């Protein structure tokens, strides 16, 4: 896949009712590698992949045009991106349509991601601990942000987090000049996406999310949280209802996050 394929890839994703804007495609394409399937009518399939250091990678944006599904195109595209990634342990988020294909090529379920979205009109003020404050993410926070992302996911995140800073707004929880949590928000699809949200515990995660739901009250918001996050009922009360879920899968070994910090919401279903 090259930059010249983005317009056609965007049309393909719209045809299967995925909300990505052309700018959303451009962001993820710049960060990774990908392959397309074409015929005389044009582009009919896509698959992208992203390396996270030398041991881990993720796969996403695996799409086949409706009229061409069930003809082995998805399997061929997956084989190409898997070859691109070599011996890395590979993560992905599977829709119901793709889950069986991924299971047949060695992926196993390790969790779920729940997609919440909607509009928040009244955002609660969540208290922090003494000495803690939420402040804007600064340019000098890059190394701290990368370290926090690596601890929360168990994978190197410097490249992804740096790229996010170019397209997203960010806030951190600062405790005596130590960054212990972060949340980012960017334009995505029909409105805005919150993620990642990284925090030591659920109360601080709620404080970070509340910052953005308050700042962007009345706007359409989306957040994808882990099924074990405990945030579902609270998000629903805010007005961000669950509309879909996908299965988190891995081929190989899953990364081992630091137990002292947790990624409550992912960046997106492609990058994790």
Model-identified regions with their sequence ranges:
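Conserved N-terminal entry element of GNAT/NAT acetyltransferase domains
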Residues: 1-3, 120-139
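Active-site-proximal cofactor/substrate-binding loop regions of enzyme domains
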Residues: 1-89
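Intrinsically disordered, low-complexity, positively biased terminal segments
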Residues: 2-7, 38-39, 51, 55, ...
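Conserved catalytic-core motifs of GNAT/GCN5-like acyltransferases
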Residues: 89-93, 108-122, 242-254
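Conserved active-site tyrosine of GNAT-family acetyltransferases
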Residues: 102-103, 107, 235
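Short, structured loop/turn "capping" segments at alpha-beta junctions
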Residues: 110-112, 127, 155-160
């Amino acid at each position: 896949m090259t930059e010249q394929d983005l317009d056609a890839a965007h049309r393909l994703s719209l045809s299967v009712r995925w909300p990505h804007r052309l700018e959303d495609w451009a962001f993820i394409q710049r960060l990774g590698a990908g392959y397309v399937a074409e015929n005389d009518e044009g582009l009919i399939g896509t698959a992208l992949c992203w390396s996270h250091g030398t041991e881990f990678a993720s796969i996403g944006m695996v799409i086949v045009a409706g009229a061409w599904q069930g003809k082995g195109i998805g399997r061929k595209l997956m084989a190409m991106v898997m070859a691109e990634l070599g011996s890395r342990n590979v993560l992905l988020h599977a829709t119901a349509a793709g889950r069986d294909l991924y299971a047949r090529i060695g992926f196993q379920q390790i969790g779920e991601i729940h997609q919440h979205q909607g509009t928040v009109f009244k955002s609660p003020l969540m208290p922090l601990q003494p000495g803690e404050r939420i402040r804007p993410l600064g340019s000098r926070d890059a190394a701290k942000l990368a370290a926090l992302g690596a601890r929360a996911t168990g994978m190197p995140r410097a490249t992804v987090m740096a790229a996010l800073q170019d397209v997203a707004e960010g806030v951190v929880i600062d405790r005596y000049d130590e960054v212990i949590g972060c949340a980012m928000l960017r334009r995505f699809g029909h409105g805005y996406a919150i993620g990642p949200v990284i925090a030591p515990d659920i109360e601080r995660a709620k404080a970070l999310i509340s910052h953005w739901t308050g700042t962007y009250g009345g706007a359409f918001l989306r957040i994808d949280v882990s099924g074990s996050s405990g945030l579902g009922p609270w998000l629903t009360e805010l007005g961000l209802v669950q509309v879909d879920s996908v299965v988190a899968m891995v081929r190989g070994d899953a990364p081992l996050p630091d137990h002292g910090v947790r990624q409550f919401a992912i960046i997106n279903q492609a990058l994790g």
